[in-house]
Amino acid sequence: MNSARLLLDTLRFRGGPPAERLATDWEHAEGTPLQRLVEFEGCSIWLYRRLRQLGVLDRVDPELNDWVSAKAHEETARNLLIEAEAESLATTFRDLGTPAVFLKGVARRLTVDRYPLADARVTNDVDVLVPVDQARDVWRALCRMGYERTNLNAAPRPEHHHLPALCGWRRVAVEVHTTNAQEVAPEEAWRRHYVAGMDVERAGVRYRVPPATELFWSGTAHGLRHPEIAFLLVLFFDAAVIWASGAPVDWAEIVRRLDAKEIVDRTAAGAWLGAAAELAGVEPPAALDGLVTRYDLERELGLRLTVLRRFRPSGALRKALAWWTSERARAVV
């Protein structure tokens, strides 16, 4: 059995083999190596949800079942804590009279009705964008409410795209952004995310979230920040979940930003988008012709699995494995 192909086919948002065939294959799938691969790729909630959809979770390898279930529940509990923090902050910003737009993971979780499975990924913190001329006042107001800096030893970075991270009693990191990236002017970031954004309501609390174009772009740009570990399923997820939903994306604007080198390594971006498209199960639009290149996800996962059958790398070795396998996946196409 090709375990790498099985994982890829199971996680793909569209297309792929029939559910009955996947279910049969999972009954005979190897346990420990796949556990290590899922851990390496950061896709435990995603896999857990898909195995439940297939109705096969209780028929997979017992150790894999126990591990993926426990890991998914642990990460989901963390996500719920972050949701509670976002709800509290939304109320705080309303009381302060400060407009704000929630970014990244929180925004995806708030829009799961528009982007199915968008909440099937661990979220690490709360990122929120506010007007640049109000950011410092908002940050200080949070400090007066009991929030503390997460790292007192870090030197201030006035040029950074967010103020020093804070955390309250929930111990969830909160980053107050003035822009989404250092190469984007604050006023432009506000236009892209807030002005073009949309309101959503949860449990009587109103939030502002970015449009599909910005969620797609931020997933791509954020994923490619560190090229040596950019080609992981958990990072492809952020763009693939938007792509697979069929939500309208301004592809001409995506091309313009690639041409403007908002992502410096355009070649890597083309391969990364090719991988995200395969995972989404979609054909890239004509606007991306010549920009998106094919990426052999099955080869990448297969090479990683070969190593992970023997040992579980960490630190620099983990980064080296991620980088080497991604280079091999790009070289054969």
Task: Give the predicted meaning of each segment.
Residues 1-124, 130-333:
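Conserved NTP-donor binding/palm subdomain of two-metal-ion nucleotidyltransferases/polymerases, i.e.
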